[in-house]
């Protein structure tokens, strides 16, 4: 479901792009060192954006190093990490684990089962550091699963649940930035859910799986209009 929040490389300077890659590599390295090699398979651009955004807001002290990469072991790359990297990595683990747990309620695919039990061993560290966020993510995914089981096709209502999850993830601290960061995360969460549902529509229809857009399977123009009218920006702020 993740991976939709990407940069437009053409709009960045060379220096900006190098820094973006350095934060991405920092997340990758941190996941490997603290949660194991397997955790890097869950690496995504959405969480990298979270690091860049929160770093810009809070300006924590960062460590910049030059390290080799498994993709290119003969050339060192810039790697940037800070306290936000640790937080984002923990959120990445929590989101991946609970999403896999949610998937097992529906499909019970072998690859999901395997990944779930592997990530179960990685969950402890992230849960111990952020138990309230972990419980909130789990509770919201349970609510989402309930709506999906009921075949709820109110896309605004359904996507708002995932918006709530990402809104909570984007709140790093309880301070004056909380409301704005929650709203940004909420909007991004709805955006991710909508795009994922839209892209999966044909496959979900063929396999008889739930999709909130299922009634528009042969109505592409109507579906586009419906998506345009969905209210992005109405967060249910958790204070």
Language model: regions and residue ranges:
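Acidic catalytic motifs of isoprenoid enzymes
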Residues: 1-183, 190, 194-228
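Residue-level detector of conserved catalytic or cofactor/ligand-binding positions
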Residues: 231-239
């Amino acid at each position: 479901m993740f991976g939709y929040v990407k940069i437009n490389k053409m709009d960045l300077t060379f220096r900006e792009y190098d820094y973006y890659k350095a934060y991405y590599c920092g997340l990758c390295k941190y996941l490997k060192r603290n949660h194991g090699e397997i955790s890097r398979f869950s690496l995504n651009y959405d969480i990298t954006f979270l690091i860049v955004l929160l770093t810009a807001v809070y300006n924590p002290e960062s460590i910049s190093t030059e390290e080799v990469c498994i993709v290119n072991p003969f050339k060192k790359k810039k790697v940037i990490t800070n306290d936000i990297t640790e937080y984002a990595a923990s959120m990445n683990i929590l989101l991946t684990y609970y999403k896999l747990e949610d998937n097992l309620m529906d499909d019970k695919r072998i690859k999901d089962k395997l990944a779930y039990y592997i990530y179960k061993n990685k969950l402890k560290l992230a849960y111990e550091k952020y138990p309230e966020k972990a419980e909130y993510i789990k509770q919201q995914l349970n609510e989402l699963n309930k709506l999906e089981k009921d075949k709820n096709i109110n896309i605004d209502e359904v996507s708002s649940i995932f918006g709530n999850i990402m809104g909570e993830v984007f709140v790093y601290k309880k301070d004056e930035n909380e409301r704005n960061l929650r709203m940004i995360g909420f909007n991004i969460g709805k955006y991710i859910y909508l795009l994922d549902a839209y892209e999966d529509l044909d496959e979900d229809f063929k396999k008889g799986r739930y999709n909130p857009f299922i009634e528009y399977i042969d109505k592409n123009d109507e579906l586009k209009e419906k998506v345009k009218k969905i209210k992005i920006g109405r967060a249910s702020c958790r204070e």
